């Protein structure tokens, strides 16, 4: 299990993934900007290596500390003289950080860790955070959506098979159920396909397919529907945190990538939802 998870996380260091993450560095920074400043110590949990984001944070005079299990990322951080913490150091940290930031990480913990592993991980983070500190979670999620059926049309025949390949993989991995395909009067699927399903299923399809097939093996195992009850269950209830704020993020840099695969004029759901959790003092 640990080997599989390590390989998965190492895949996040590939060039395509890092380029996309760096493209959205400004959005990652905006989610925490108001909390930063002198005498603030920030842990970027599951940091990856995003030089532009790190530069933005350190320019506020915040003490930035990265944490990532990837040996490749750790080497990049070390080569660039960026402060990072090891697993052993984090396990022994107590009341050390003012802010713990998880950007596009919570859904991975939900997808890859067992229940006991999650419990242990969040207890570790709780110990590392100062009293009255803040956990900020920025992750996938359609926000408050209804269970009503909606539809999405694939952009062209050129990408029809690619989108369908994603759907089959997501179904195989129990991330979604198979959506309905719109047919003509003779019950033949209309090409390019139009899919009908609930909002959460369409959200999963859209934001997975946008990565391209090179990311299929990795991303098709992950659910992108993060909703507040999961945060309540795993952090708030066991550790006494309160969600003080949540807001939707619409990152327009995703639009041209989405339009390659789907006929849309704008982004129909948030690209991320940002949750702020306050620890009891």
Q: Where would I find each of the regions flagged by the language model?
A:
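Short alpha-helix
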Residues: 221-239
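Conserved class I S-adenosyl-L-methionine
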Residues: 136-199
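A short, conserved alpha-helix within the catalytic core of class I
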Residues: 109-124
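Core SAM-dependent methyltransferase catalytic element
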Residues: 259-281
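Short glycine-dipeptide loop
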Residues: 129-135
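Class I SAM-dependent methyltransferase SAM/SAH-binding core
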Residues: 43-91
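Class I SAM-dependent methyltransferase Rossmann-like catalytic core
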Residues: 1-35
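A conserved beta-strand element that flanks and buttresses the S-adenosyl-L-methionine
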Residues: 101
């Amino acid at each position: 299990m640990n080997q599989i998870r390590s390989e998965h996380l190492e895949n996040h260091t590939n060039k395509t993934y890092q380029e996309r993450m760096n493209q959205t560095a400004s959005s990652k920074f905006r989610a925490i900007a108001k909390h930063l400043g002198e005498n603030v110590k920030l842990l970027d949990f599951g940091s990856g290596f995003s030089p532009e984001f790190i530069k933005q944070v350190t320019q506020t005079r915040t003490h930035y500390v990265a944490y990532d299990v990837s040996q490749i990322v750790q080497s990049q951080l070390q080569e660039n003289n960026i402060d990072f913490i090891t697993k052993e150091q984090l396990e022994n940290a107590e009341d050390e950080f003012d802010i713990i930031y998880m950007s596009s990480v919570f859904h991975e913990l939900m997808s890859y860790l067992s229940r006991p592993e999650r419990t242990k991980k969040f207890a570790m983070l709780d110990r590392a955070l100062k009293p009255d500190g803040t956990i900020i979670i920025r992750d996938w999620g359609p926000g408050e959506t209804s269970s009503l059926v909606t539809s999405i049309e694939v952009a062209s025949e050129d990408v029809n098979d690619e989108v369908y390949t994603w759907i089959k993989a997501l179904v195989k991995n129990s991330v979604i159920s198979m959506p309905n395909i719109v047919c003509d009067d003779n019950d033949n699927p209309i090409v390019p396909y139009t899919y009908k399903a609930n909002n959460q299923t369409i959200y999963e399809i859209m934001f997975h397919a946008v990565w391209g097939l090179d990311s299929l093996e990795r991303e098709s195992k992950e659910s992108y529907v993060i909703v507040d009850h999961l945060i309540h269950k795993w952090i708030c209830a066991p550790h006494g945190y309160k969600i003080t704020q949540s807001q939707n993020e619409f990152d327009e840099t995703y639009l041209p990538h989405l339009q390659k695969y789907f006929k849309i004029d704008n982004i129909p759901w948030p690209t991320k939802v940002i949750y702020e959790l306050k620890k009891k003092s």
